[in-house]
């Protein structure tokens, strides 16, 4: 499979810096555009319950999620790839993960998740 160049919207890093500086942001949802060549911020969430966080994750679509766990001040990078996602889409999100992680200084933990149950103990 041909490797694609993934462009990173600068807002991805800007929102990450806000999350690190303890602004009201608790999680950042990153998504690839329809051409799978641009990673952008889909949404940010302020402090919400664990249940609300889990409900905000699309069950059938991949996302890259940056989550700040305030109880221990850790920043977790989550690569959410549901089981039903096609291999080509999973590959694109893998490339996007690699590209964005090179720009984000301060990630404490990395998780590859295929089932929401894995996130129930964040």
Curated annotation (Swiss-Prot):
Keywords attached to this Swiss-Prot or TrEMBL record, sorted alphabetically, are: Actin-binding, Cytoplasm, Cytoskeleton
Location relative to the cell: Cytoplasm, Cytoskeleton
Q: Which Pfam families match?
A: Cofilin_ADF (PF00241)
Among PROSITE patterns, the record links this protein to: ADF_H (PS51263)
Primary site of residence: cytoplasm
GO CC annotation terms, alphabetical: actin cytoskeleton; cytoplasm
**One MF annotation (Gene Ontology) recorded for this entry:** actin filament binding
Q: Record's Gene3D superfamilies? A: Severin
Q: Give the UniProt family note.
A: Belongs to the actin-binding proteins ADF family.
Protein name per its UniProtKB record: Cofilin-5
| Organism encoding this protein | Dictyostelium discoideum (Social amoeba)
Gene responsible for this protein: cofF
């Amino acid at each position: 499979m041909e490797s694609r160049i993934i462009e990173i919207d600068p807002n991805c890093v800007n929102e990450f810096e806000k999350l690190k500086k303890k602004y009201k942001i608790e999680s950042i949802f990153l998504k690839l555009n329809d051409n799978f060549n641009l990673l952008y911020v889909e949404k940010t969430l302020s402090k919400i319950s664990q249940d609300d966080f889990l409900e905000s994750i699309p069950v059938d679509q991949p996302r890259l999620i940056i989550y700040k766990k305030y109880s221990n001040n850790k920043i977790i990078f989550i690569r959410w790839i549901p089981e039903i996602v096609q291999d080509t889409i999973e590959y694109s999100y893998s490339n996007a993960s690699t590209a964005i992680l090179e720009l984000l200084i301060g990630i404490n933990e990395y998780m590859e998740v295929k089932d929401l149950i894995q996130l129930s103990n964040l």
